[in-house]
């Protein structure tokens, strides 16, 4: 249904001088998709409110809604090219007016878990890379063909978006930071067997592959309304340091069916282990933490086992934040069990002593 539209968007991006890598293509597709999704969501909520005789308070001001600037329509439903911005006017509006307006939501939001805060965070962390307002106009019209109304439409969009993430992961450079092969993720989920009511966590979530696949695993069968609400609101938490990965994670979870993803833009390793309380702990942890990274000495001071290897720091964090009786599946490099350095030996001992009452798949 939407596969050709995604191909058309990619063709536009490949011809755009401001976009040169698969990471750029995914980034630009992501912010456009997000704004189209947000407009569809608001239109749906407004209609639902109208049906029960209530007024809906829009998040986005009318002048900056998708239907006003990206795809103004004629009465027959076709794009009104007489009123649609194009060329330098479109680029000027996006860079000087739209993005600053959207960035301002972060300061105006009442708390970090609101959609308003996430809007501000997303548009504070990415930028418009389109240099040609004609290319952007073409991309907008293709994006406008996409719909987020039905579960079937979201399902297809999620698969197409996952394909873009996979291409980005295979593109070299730092693309692998964003993508874990889905067969590996599904195998780990089958072993750990999360259940409805578990709180599931990934402290290095990348594109949120583990969280999305856990959602797909848990939503199978005939769930009650209460169970569906639990999945939507009280199950998944992700943390991500990289700006682009944060944006992709939110969009990926939205396309899989989580309306307000609890993805936090932060460096997990800067959190003090001694501050973690029982209420902060999780029943299930999935993660593929980055290997070979380095953290500043002051960050390493948060951990009892001092090491510059970020994967080992993440393991200590996961041990601390996993509930007693909890289960974890973590990808770790294959030399971990044979390395003879002090940090590896100490961490293996810590796993043996601290995880007797927890199940871990490493």
State where each predicted segment sits.
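Hydrophobic C-terminal alpha-helix "anchor/cap" residues
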Residues: 143, 351-352
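Non-catalytic, mostly N-terminal accessory regions of nucleic-acid modification and defense proteins
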Residues: 1-196, 264-271
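Conserved S-adenosyl-L-methionine
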Residues: 175-287, 292-294, 299, 306-308, ...
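Short glycine-dipeptide loop
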Residues: 322-328
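A generic secondary-structure signal for well-formed alpha-helical elements
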Residues: 36-42, 168, 208, 218, ...
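Acceptor-substrate binding/catalytic loop of class I
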Residues: 336-340
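Conserved small/polar residues in nucleotide/adenosyl-binding loops
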Residues: 361-362
């Amino acid at each position: 249904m939407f596969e050709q539209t995604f191909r058309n968007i990619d063709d536009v991006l490949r011809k755009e001088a401001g976009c040169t890598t698969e990471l750029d293509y995914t980034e630009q597709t992501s912010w456009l998709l997000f704004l189209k999704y947000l407009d569809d969501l608001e239109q749906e909520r407004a209609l639902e409110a109208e049906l029960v005789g209530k007024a809906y308070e829009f998040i986005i001001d009318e002048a900056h809604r998708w239907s006003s600037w990206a795809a103004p329509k004629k009465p027959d439903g076709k794009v009104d090219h007489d009123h649609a911005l194009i060329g330098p006017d479109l680029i000027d509006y996006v860079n000087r007016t739209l993005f600053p307006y959207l960035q301002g939501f972060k300061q105006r939001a009442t708390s970090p878990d609101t959609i308003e805060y996430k809007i501000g965070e997303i548009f504070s962390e990415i930028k418009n890379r389109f240099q040609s307002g004609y290319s952007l106009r073409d991309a907008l019209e293709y994006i406008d063909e996409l719909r987020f109304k039905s579960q079937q439409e979201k399902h297809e969009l999620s698969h197409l978006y996952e394909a873009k993430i996979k291409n980005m992961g295979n593109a070299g450079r730092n693309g692998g930071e964003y993508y874990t092969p889905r067969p590996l993720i599904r195998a780990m989920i089958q072993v750990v067997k999360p259940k409805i009511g578990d709180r599931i966590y990934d402290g290095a979530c990348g594109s949120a592959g583990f969280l999305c696949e856990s959602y797909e695993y848990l939503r199978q069968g005939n769930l009650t309304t209460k169970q569906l609400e639990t999945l939507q609101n009280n199950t998944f938490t992700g943390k991500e340091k990289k700006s682009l990965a944060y944006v992709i994670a939110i969009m990926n979870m939205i396309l899989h069916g989580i309306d307000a993803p609890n993805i936090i833009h932060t460096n997990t390793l800067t959190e003090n282990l001694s501050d973690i309380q029982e209420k902060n702990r999780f029943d299930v942890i999935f993660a593929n933490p980055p290997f070979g990274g380095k953290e500043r000495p002051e960050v390493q001071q948060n951990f009892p086992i001092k090491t510059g290897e970020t994967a080992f720091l993440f393991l200590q964090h996961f041990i601390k934040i996993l509930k007693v009786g909890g289960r974890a599946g973590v990808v770790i490099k294959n030399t971990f069990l044979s390395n003879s350095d002090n940090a590896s030996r100490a961490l293996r001992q810590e796993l043996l002593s601290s995880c007797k009452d927890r199940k871990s798949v490493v």
